[in-house]
């Protein structure tokens, strides 16, 4: 069973993603604020973080912060089509993949499965 974190500022989206993950056997924690998510993750390791990417989050380097807590943590960022550049920056900062909004449940499930089955390259 994967342990997952959802960081999204919109309650409805957070709850939708949570429901999908729970239906797929995940343990899930949800947060609306970056600082609370990072603080919780520092003492509660997770396998996957799904982060709704906002411009200010790239500046704060949320992906790097999460990866510093666990190199093996997988990160899926959610972004709107208009913010594709943000997704590219997030990938440069440690995100593993991205998904464009609006969220399609089947695509979300496929991305989550794909990310969690990727192997971490050995150094």
Give the ranges of each region predicted by the language model.
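C-terminal output helix
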Residues: 85, 103-112
